[in-house]
Amino acid sequence: MSEQRYNRYEKARILGARALQVSYGAPVLIDTDQTEPILVAAEEYDAGALPFTVRRESN
């Protein structure tokens, strides 16, 4: 399975959703020194550790 590429809107939605989860106490999926939820989410995204998928509708 190839890695899915996300556009800027999908990436923003994924990072925002994950940052909200982290801010509510969800476990962090990678080792990081960051404390800000959005920065934690960004590092997880860069590491490919986020369990999110995007379903695109075909016309």
Curated annotation (Swiss-Prot):
Q: Name one Pfam family in it.
A: RNA_pol_Rpb6
List the GO terms this entry assigns under cellular component, sorted alphabetically.
Answer: cytoplasm; DNA-directed RNA polymerase complex
Keyword terms: Cytoplasm, DNA-directed RNA polymerase, Nucleotidyltransferase, Transcription, Transferase
**Which biological process annotations from GO are given for this protein?**
transcription by RNA polymerase I; transcription by RNA polymerase II; tRNA transcription by RNA polymerase III
This enzyme catalyses: RNA(n) + a ribonucleoside 5'-triphosphate = RNA(n+1) + diphosphate
Q: Where in the cell is it found?
A: Cytoplasm
Superkingdom, natural source: Archaea
Query: Mind listing the GO molecular function terms for this protein?
Result: DNA binding; DNA-directed RNA polymerase activity
User: Principal place where this protein is found?
Assistant: cytoplasm
Q: Which family is this sequence assigned to?
A: Belongs to the archaeal Rpo6/eukaryotic RPB6 RNA polymerase subunit family.
Q: Which HAMAP family match?
A: RNApol_arch_Rpo6
Summary of the function given for this chain in its UniProt record: DNA-dependent RNA polymerase (RNAP) catalyzes the transcription of DNA into RNA using the four ribonucleoside triphosphates as substrates.
Subunit structure, briefly?
Part of the RNA polymerase complex.
The record, for PANTHER family, names: DNA-DIRECTED RNA POLYMERASE SUBUNIT K (PTHR47227), DNA-DIRECTED RNA POLYMERASES I, II, AND III SUBUNIT RPABC2 (PTHR47227:SF5)
How is this protein named in the record?
DNA-directed RNA polymerase subunit Rpo6
Give the source species.
Halorubrum lacusprofundi (strain ATCC 49239 / DSM 5036 / JCM 8891 / ACAM 34)
Give the gene symbol.
rpo6
